[in-house]
């Protein structure tokens, strides 16, 4: 008999199967292969149709991006609970239109990552450009350009000194969190909608939690 409960269970089984395949037959194999080469992997798990916390846990360095503090905390939270030394961020990808962001804008974005627990900053926006290319050189979609053709290049070192000092303390310190929020992945995977697969981020699941509490 077709019932909401049975439909939810079938949907959960399908999504859990995809989850297991992505973790066991892709992410773990990738990490093992890298380890055999003496390397580690850095992975942005958010957006995957699987439990992103488990995917982050497979990575040697969980990596996050974005501007929402709740979402930013997803990767560092896994690093804290799994005993990983580093959690990184794809930083300052798109803060304004091309060449309109200044180092103050970049620092503001980096401080949000630090507040979320990130302790290993990666700049996003360094594009290869031949020396003979006319100014401003080769560009790509990311609007903050960390290269010598940007007028802030001469002062970039001062921001890096700040980043080095802050993240060195964060890397040497010990996380101290008062609250551990349950990630109710089973409930989310059972929810029916217009998509067979759901692509998860920390913010989406937190919002689902809040909505469920209101319904109850």
Annotate each language-model stretch with its function.
Residues 1-216:
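Carbohydrate-binding surfaces of carbohydrate-active enzymes
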């Amino acid at each position: 008999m077709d019932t909401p409960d049975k439909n939810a269970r079938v949907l959960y089984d399908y999504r859990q199967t995809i989850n297991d395949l992505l973790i066991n037959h892709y992410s773990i194999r990738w990490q093992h292969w890298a380890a055999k080469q003496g390397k580690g992997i850095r992975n942005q798990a958010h957006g995957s149709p699987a439990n992103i916390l488990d995917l982050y846990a497979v990575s040697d360095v969980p990596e996050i991006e974005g501007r929402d503090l709740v979402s930013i905390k997803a990767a560092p939270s896994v690093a804290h609970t799994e005993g990983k030394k580093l959690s990184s961020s794809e930083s300052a990808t798109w803060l304004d239109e091309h060449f309109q962001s200044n180092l103050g804008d970049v620092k503001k974005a980096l401080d949000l990552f630090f507040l979320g627990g990130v302790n290993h900053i990666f700049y996003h926006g360094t594009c290869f450009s031949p020396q003979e290319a006319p100014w401003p050189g080769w560009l790509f979609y990311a609007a903050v350009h960390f290269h010598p053709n940007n007028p802030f290049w001469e002062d970039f070192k001062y921001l890096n000194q700040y980043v080095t000092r802050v993240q060195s303390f964060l890397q040497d310190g010990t996380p101290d969190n008062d609250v551990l929020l349950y990630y109710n992945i089973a409930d989310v995977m059972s929810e029916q909608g217009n998509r067979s697969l759901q692509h998860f981020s920390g913010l989406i699941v937190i919002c689902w939690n809040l909505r469920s509490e209101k319904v109850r």
